[in-house]
Amino acid sequence: MPAQDNSRFVIRDRNWHPKALTPDYKTSIARSPRQALVSIPQSISETTGPNFSHLGFGAHDHDLLLNFNNGGLPIGERIIVAGRVVDQYGKPVPNTLVEMWQANAGGRYRHKNDRYLAPLDPNFGGVGRCLTDSDGYYSFRTIKPGPYPWRNGPNDWRPAHIHFGISGPSIATKLITQLYFEGDPLIPMCPIVKSIANPEAVQQLIAKLDMNNANPMDCLAYRFDIVLRGQRKTHFENC
């Protein structure tokens, strides 16, 4: 397949992606398919998608320190999360919608079904969105999320993480994934992370400290690049 043909997608590497059924990750038992997957031919339905450049974005949609402000600033470690979205050939993906959602510094989501005992932060909503620029770059300012317990095992904890949704240029490039933070000791203990057999694929999910992008006296920064589709695409969230 010629590299310049961006209307079709290269075959994904099944060894790069986790198996759908990983019993240590309890939820996968009910969610994994029991029958062989069916390959669907690529058509215009898969190779095209919505254009989000016309959306009206608020001034603070990408700034989670300010977009749920109720008279104060949220509690926690202030950080910048930024990176570049590229396609299966390493080319930047401009003007694509990037959405993110996360727990607060105490490890609690602003969601009615989250019953973790950590308190909600009255000044933190935990959601943001932006469009990539002409070179595929995005940036958010937020609070570093806290870890939290989950009902997988007797004492399983999720590492600090941020969920990302990237639309890409077509329906087939839509990606839901998770960012983890460099140096977190909970990463190798997490059953979701351990479902990914390839250590390089795991490393692709770990944001690295980026002092060049930090704001002095304000925020540390972490770099998280995202690959849509292809042999080395960013891992699709298995939860």
Swiss-Prot record:
InterPro entries per the UniProt record, alphabetical: Intradiol_dOase_C, Intradiol_dOase_core, Intradiol_RC_Dioxygenase, PCDO_beta_N, Protocat_dOase_b
Cofactor note: Binds Fe(3+) ion per subunit.
Functional pathway: Aromatic compound metabolism; beta-ketoadipate pathway; 3-carboxy-cis,cis-muconate from 3,4-dihydroxybenzoate: step 1/1
SUPFAM superfamilies recorded: Aromatic compound dioxygenase
Reaction(s) the record says it catalyses: 3,4-dihydroxybenzoate + O2 = 3-carboxy-cis,cis-muconate + 2 H(+)
Keyword Metal-binding: yes
Protein EC: 1.13.11.3
GO molecular function: ferric iron binding; protocatechuate 3,4-dioxygenase activity
BP GO annotations: 3,4-dihydroxybenzoate catabolic process; beta-ketoadipate pathway
Domain of life: Bacteria
Binding site for Fe cation: 109, 148, 161, 163
Sorted UniProt keywords: Aromatic hydrocarbons catabolism, Dioxygenase, Iron, Metal-binding, Oxidoreductase
Cross-referenced PROSITE patterns: INTRADIOL_DIOXYGENAS (PS00083)
Cofactor dependency: Fe(3+)
Pfam families associated with the record: Dioxygenase_C (PF00775), PCDO_beta_N (PF12391)
Summary of subunit composition and partner proteins: The enzyme is an oligomer of 12 copies of the alpha and beta chains.
Family: Belongs to the intradiol ring-cleavage dioxygenase family.
Task of the protein: Plays an essential role in the utilization of numerous aromatic and hydroaromatic compounds via the beta-ketoadipate pathway.
Protein name listed in UniProt: Protocatechuate 3,4-dioxygenase beta chain
